[in-house]
From Swiss-Prot:
Residues the record marks as active site: C42
Pfam families, alphabetized: GSHPx
Intracellular or extracellular location(s): Cytoplasm
Function: Protects cells and enzymes from oxidative damage, by catalyzing the reduction of hydrogen peroxide, lipid peroxides and organic hydroperoxide, by glutathione.
EC number: 1.11.1.12
Range of residues in the leader sequence: none
Record's protein name: Probable phospholipid hydroperoxide glutathione peroxidase
Keyword Oxidoreductase: yes
Organism (species): Encephalitozoon cuniculi (strain GB-M1)
Coiled-coil regions, chain positions: none
Amino acid sequence: MERGMESEAFYGLSARGWDGSEVSLGSFRGCVIMIANVASSCKFAESNYKSFAGLLDKFYRKGLRILLFPCNQYLGQESRPIEEIRGEVSKKYSDRFVVFDKVDVFGKGAHPVFRHLVNTKNGKGRLGNFIKWNFTKFLVDRKGCVVKRFGPSDIVKEDDENLLRSIEDGENGMQNS
């Protein structure tokens, strides 16, 4: 998919927020975005949530936004109500997370956000466009293009070159800060 088309397709997507409101990804135009499918009972939860909170502490003012999409498809590891999930991650890790309603990330019912992400050039993983587990992460630049896909056990660090390049690129022109 051509970058301009990828960008417009991304910003044209929306998802239901934890409170039931429809949230347009276009509202994050100009921000660097990390999108992850999450599950609180997953063995990767603690390390990823701590990493995300640290990234927000360092880069929130520079336009980083982390969008969490709870998913119960993998061994039922996110079976709690969405209000509980949001409450826990907000209290224990960061109140800056953007938490969405539960979604499916694979199969016929896969949410359009994840269908889009896995079908971009940089959104494919080792298994092609299949998301193999919780905490698969997608880094999206300020133009709405997927820069990198991280696996469930990959902990995104503050010095990750793709993250730093995305943060630095266009920082002065960012919106939604």
